[in-house]
Curated annotation (Swiss-Prot):
Transmembrane segments: none annotated. This is RNA polymerase II holoenzyme cyclin-like subunit. Component of the SRB8-11 complex. The SRB8-11 complex is a regulatory module of the Mediator complex which is itself involved in regulation of basal and activated RNA polymerase II-dependent transcription. The SRB8-11 complex may be involved in the transcriptional repression of a subset of genes regulated by Mediator. It may inhibit the association of the Mediator complex with RNA polymerase II to form the holoenzyme complex. The SRB8-11 complex phosphorylates the C-terminal domain (CTD) of the largest subunit of RNA polymerase II. GO terms for molecular function: cyclin-dependent protein serine/threonine kinase regulator activity; RNA polymerase II core promoter sequence-specific DNA binding. InterPro entries: Cyclin-like_dom, Cyclin-like_sf, Cyclin/Ssn8, Cyclin_N. Coiled coil: none annotated. It is found in: Nucleus. The lineage of its organism: Eukaryota, Fungi, Dikarya, Ascomycota, Saccharomycotina. The gene is SSN8.
Length: 280
């Protein structure tokens, strides 16, 4: 197990470029017949990702599983679907399996019968009472992930960067509610491809940027506009001196904005019906 991100399998084996990711996904289309491919392409990929995110969190909530474990499961799911196209295998089974494996890797194991029972109670039409189905899917999942299962998350980077901000300039000290908002954005970032394309600290910085700069209009309700402007300038000075890649960070911000724009048009009920057409 690597002690840090820079020597980890996450960086050495699972840090992709946008071009590589697009090529992989394009290649996956070849396995489907034209009819099914047309049905899959009719799905809004953002809505599918949001739906899978809600499935993971619903199962996690029912099992009282910590957010970090669910984040690990989401990374597994995103990686898996760069190797296996959505629609080839029961997504509800893959979700349950990803959570099961993540619990073991993050040293908070759940019994396979517990996972099976809870998943079946949520999705009885798609989950068998037989726990060996998850066991079989576990081997498939781990094989497609290349057995690289240790995940580094942006949560630690968030706290490190916020501490550095406070030391650099008291004016840009993040308030507890700002930390919470940024933490929630990081949770949402797992719906995207950001964790395949960027180191954790880039994702953390992008979410901090969105909180401090893009949500500054909220601060204007309690602070004079000049004070808000001065704070943003101080943050941008910190950002410039931090040596964090600006272009990568802005790309992340744009991806997060795209997520939220598409999330506004998301209907869980409609997405569930459309996904059922693909997997039946």
């Amino acid at each position: 197990m690597s002690a840090n991100y820079w020597t980890s399998s996450q960086r050495l084996h699972w840090l992709l470029t946008k071009e590589t990711l697009a090529e992989r996904r394009k290649g996956l289309e070849d396995i489907f017949d034209p009819g099914k491919l047309q049905t899959i392409k009719a799905l809004n990929p953002w809505h599918v990702r949001v739906y899978l995110h809600t499935l993971i969190h619903l199962l996690g909530q029912n099992l009282s599983i910590r957010q970090r474990i669910l984040a690990t499961a989401e990374v597994y799911l995103t990686r898996f679907h760069t190797k296996v196209p959505f629609g080839e295998i029961n997504p509800y089974l893959v979700v349950a399996t990803a959570v099961y494996v993540a619990c073991k890797v993050e040293e908070h194991p759940q019994h396979i019968r517990t996972i099976t029972s809870e998943a079946r109670s949520l999705w009885p039409d798609y989950i068998s009472h037989d726990p060996t189905k998850i066991a079989e899917c576990e081997f498939y999942l781990i094989e497609e992930l290349g057995t690289y299962l240790v995940i580094f998350h942006p949560y630690k980077s968030l706290m490190q960067i916020s501490d550095a901000m406070a030391r650099s300039n008291a004016q840009i000290t993040m308030a507890p509610e700002e930390i919470q908002v940024t933490w929630s954005m990081i949770n949402d970032s797992y719906i995207t491809d950001l964790h395949l394309l960027n180191p954790p600290h880039i994702v953390a910085m992008a979410c901090i940027y969105m909180t401090v700069v893009l949500r500054s209009h909220i601060m204007r309700m309690t602070m004079p506009s000049e004070a808000v402007k001065s704070r943003i300038e101080a943050f941008m000075t910190f950002f410039g001196e931090s040596n964090v890649d600006l272009e990568q960070t802005i790309d992340c911000v744009q991806e997060m904005i795209s997520l939220y724009v598409n999330w506004d048009t998301y209907s869980e009920k409609q997405c569930r019906v459309e996904i059922a057409k693909v997997i039946t």
